[in-house]
C-alpha cells in the first residue's frame, strides 16, 4: 500500500494553492511515495546505542567578534527622510482601515 495517496497529494496541493493536473497528481504521488519509503528505511536504522551529538564535525565559530560601534543618532537617521512626524518616518498607508 502506498504511503501517500493521490487524494492526499491533491489535498496538499489545494492547501499549497497549487493547480495540478491529473497527470501531475499521479506523478507526484509516486515521487512522494518513493521519498517516504526512503525515509522509512532511515527510521529503521538501529541507533539506540549511538550517543546524541549536536554536530558530528568539529566546527568552530568563524564569525567576527561582537564589538559595539557607534551608530546613528535618531536625528541623523531621520535627516534623509522625505517626511518625519513626531520623530518617526512617515510612509504611505498600505492597509485600509481595520486591517
Curated annotation (Swiss-Prot):
Keywords: ATP-binding, Ligase, Nucleotide-binding, Protein biosynthesis. GO terms for molecular function: asparaginyl-tRNA synthase (glutamine-hydrolyzing) activity; ATP binding; glutaminyl-tRNA synthase (glutamine-hydrolyzing) activity. It comes from the Bacteria. Transmembrane segments: none annotated. It is an enzyme of class 6 (ligase). It catalyses: L-glutamyl-tRNA(Gln) + L-glutamine + ATP + H2O = L-glutaminyl-tRNA(Gln) + L-glutamate + ADP + phosphate + H(+); L-aspartyl-tRNA(Asn) + L-glutamine + ATP + H2O = L-asparaginyl-tRNA(Asn) + L-glutamate + ADP + phosphate + 2 H(+). The keyword Endoplasmic reticulum does not apply. Its EC number is 6.3.5.-. It holds the Pfam family GatC. Disulfide bonds: none annotated. GO terms for biological process: glutaminyl-tRNAGln biosynthesis via transamidation; regulation of translational fidelity; translation. Belongs to the GatC family. Allows the formation of correctly charged Asn-tRNA(Asn) or Gln-tRNA(Gln) through the transamidation of misacylated Asp-tRNA(Asn) or Glu-tRNA(Gln) in organisms which lack either or both of asparaginyl-tRNA or glutaminyl-tRNA synthetases. The reaction takes place in the presence of glutamine and ATP through an activated phospho-Asp-tRNA(Asn) or phospho-Glu-tRNA(Gln). Heterotrimer of A, B and C subunits. This is Aspartyl/glutamyl-tRNA(Asn/Gln) amidotransferase subunit C. It comes from Rhodococcus jostii (strain RHA1). The lineage of its organism: Bacteria, Bacillati, Actinomycetota, Actinomycetes, Mycobacteriales.
Amino acid at each position: 500500500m502506498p504511503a501517500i495517496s493521490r487524494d492526499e497529494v491533491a489535498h496538499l496541493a489545494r492547501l499549497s494553492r497549487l493547480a495540478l493536473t491529473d497527470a501531475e497528481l499521479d506523478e507526484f504521488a509516486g515521487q512522494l511515495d518513493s521519498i517516504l519509503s526512503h525515509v522509512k528505511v532511515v527510521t529503521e536504522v538501529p541507533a539506540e546505542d549511538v550517543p546524541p551529538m549536536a554536530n558530528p564535525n568539529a566546527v568552530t565559530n568563524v564569525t567576527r567578534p561582537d564589538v559595539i560601534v557607534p551608530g546613528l543618532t535618531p536625528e541623523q537617521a531621520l535627516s534623509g527622510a522625505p517626511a518625519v512626524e513626531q520623530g518617526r518616518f512617515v510612509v504611505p498607508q498600505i492597509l485600509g482601515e481595520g486591517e
